[in-house]
Amino acid sequence: VSATAPLLLDDRSSANLCSDPGNNSSACWRLVTDGVMGGVSDGRLQPAQIDGRSCLRLTGAVSTLNNGGFIQASLDLDNAGLLDARTYRGIEIDVYGNAETYNLHLRNADTRIVWQSYRASFQAPPRWQTVRLPFAELQPYRIEKPLDLSRLRRLGLVAIGRDMQADLCFARVSFYP
C-alpha cells in the first residue's frame, strides 16, 4: 500500500524553530555543530524571509579543524516515538541556497551511534527549488543494516565534510508518495 498524499513535516507556517504542519505533534528544529566533538564550526539557525517565502535559514562557517566539519539543522520526526514512512517513496524539500552541496541525513532506530545515518547529497541553487530525494538512493554511512523506513527517528539538513560557508534556506519538508 502506498500513500496518496504527501506527509507534511514542516511548511514554515510557524514563526519560530518549531514545525507546525497541523499534525498531532509539533517538533522543533535545532542546530547541531561539530562542537559536540571538539570541532570549531560555527552556525546559526533562524527563521527568515527569502525571496518572498518563510523559511528556516542555516548559516555558518564549516571548518575541518580539530576533526570537525559540520553544522546541521535537525528535526525529530515524531515526539511520541518512531515514524513509519513505508508508504512513502522519499523526502521532498524546498530549498534556496548559495550553490553549495548539502546533505540530507536520516536516522532510524538502528542508528545508535551519533555518526551513523543514511545520506544523500543535493545542490541548493540561489533560487527556490524543490529537491526530491528517494529513500532508495540514501546511502548507509557507518552502518551495515539496510534502511528500515518503519522506524524513522530524525532527519538533518547538513553542511558537511569541507571548509565552506553554509547558507541554506528550507521552506517545506515532506515525505512524498
Question: What is the predicted role of each segment?
Answer:
Residues 1-177:
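Beta-rich carbohydrate-recognition modules and glycan-binding surfaces
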